[in-house]
Amino acid sequence: KNCLIDGGSSDVSSVGAYRIEPYLLYCGIRNIDYAFVSHGDEDHISGIRELLEDQRLGIGIRTLVLPAEEYWDEKLKELAVLAAENGTRIAEIHAGEQVVDGTGEQKMSLRCIGPEMGLSESGNAASMVLQAEYGNFSMLLTGDVEGAGEKQLVKSGRLGKCRILKAAHHGSPHPILPSRCLSS
């Protein structure tokens, strides 16, 4: 299955049309089975929005995966409406749920480890956090989680070891969970 996790830009216009779509077509990918969106900031959704608007001609998105609806801001609500209008299935993923493809050594899973229900903050703090696993490879994808969401993640006990950390805020100078990263 083909998965896209976030896709946008706050400083490159038409990132979907001029960067994401050409790259996917170059790789021979014409359909995205699951497009995950961690939260509603433009730098995470603008390219996915473009793909949804143009999928009859370009890249098709079969399922748009969003965090729990209680964390949707206006941009995520608009994205869900756009997806539905263009025939894309909408799915929510909650902490503890996962998408799995394949079996045995070929098994790939994307497990949602945050946010837990009832987080008092929204926006970046409520970013969807995913643990990707394929064989012995693991990667933590943090969206832009911060503050209460980051603290909740540590307390949840869901954080596992990972080989690669996709740092929150695109590698900001204020890294997620520095003590946790050192212990992994």
Model-derived regions: residue spans:
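Non-globular, low-confidence helical/coil segments that flank catalytic cores
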Residues: 1-184
